[in-house]
């Protein structure tokens, strides 16, 4: 399937995965959230979302000046149907795709930007990314929904506005709206583009899920790494792109590998391949997925790659950057 496709009434979009090349916590905020520093890398691998646009229009308002009278939740229920997500959440309202559509409508109402007529849209999710893996699947679904419905419904918010809406849904949503590799700060919404070399990765997805709230509350989690300047991160990419050198790390790794034996096993498997791959294995996000950057020499050795995938202790995928 192509990454993105459009027919007369169906729009198909890749909802890509992400990995964190490193992940630091630099302190706790007054609002209870934590400040982070990371480099996000988007992957040419993920879920697919199919948006089918109906001919039927819903009259949303009597006039463009009457936005305040609209109930966005009720309107979203009329406008949006969702399939393929039945096993993810107990109800459509809890799904991040629906939440994204609802947040988009709410922002349009609040800014008096809601068009008078909107078409109904059916969204079908083809889920490929495992949940709770640190790959950003749900957040990517939300971001893709915001981007596509913003155009279908002709709300026409700019990227900065969509990023603000995305941040209200989840900390990882903004990077997928930004749409390119980036240095991230704050809770993940302060994004600076970064140019990184083309890269392929071996990604392992062990069946393990550790509650994120439990991780952030864990006594062994390091929460006070000294912040790095954007310039430092830009100028020292050799310390985290292929290898992971001090001070770069993923602070969640020791906590997660202690709590989840399957993650520890998967990471140890990749660590045994580091000498051949000429790189450093690591975990993405707060887990459970782990990955190994691959040297060009490894990529050309198809038999060796096939062996690594076959012998992996859990599902393994060969992917590249977006």
UniProtKB/Swiss-Prot annotation:
Gene Ontology MF term list: 4-(cytidine 5'-diphospho)-2-C-methyl-D-erythritol kinase activity; ATP binding
Enzyme type, top EC level: transferase
InterPro entries: GHMP_kinase_C_sf, GHMP_kinase_N_dom, IspE, Ribosomal_Su5_D2-typ_SF, Ribsml_uS5_D2-typ_fold_subgr
GO BP, one annotated term: isopentenyl diphosphate biosynthetic process, methylerythritol 4-phosphate pathway
Keywords: ATP-binding, Isoprene biosynthesis, Kinase, Nucleotide-binding, Transferase
Binding site for ATP: 130-140
SUPFAM superfamilies in the cross-refs: GHMP Kinase, C-terminal domain, Ribosomal protein S5 domain 2-like
Pathway this chain belongs to: Isoprenoid biosynthesis; isopentenyl diphosphate biosynthesis via DXP pathway; isopentenyl diphosphate from 1-deoxy-D-xylulose 5-phosphate: step 3/6
Catalytic activity field: 4-CDP-2-C-methyl-D-erythritol + ATP = 4-CDP-2-C-methyl-D-erythritol 2-phosphate + ADP + H(+)
Superkingdom, natural source: Bacteria
UniProt keyword annotation of Transmembrane present: no
UniProt keyword annotation of Transcription regulation present: no
Assigned EC number: 2.7.1.148
Active-site residues, record numbering mapped to chain: 18, 172
Function: Catalyzes the phosphorylation of the position 2 hydroxy group of 4-diphosphocytidyl-2C-methyl-D-erythritol.
Protein family according to the UniProt entry: Belongs to the GHMP kinase family. IspE subfamily.
HAMAP family the record matches: IspE
Protein name in the entry: 4-diphosphocytidyl-2-C-methyl-D-erythritol kinase
Species name: Psychrobacter cryohalolentis (strain ATCC BAA-1226 / DSM 17306 / VKM B-2378 / K5)
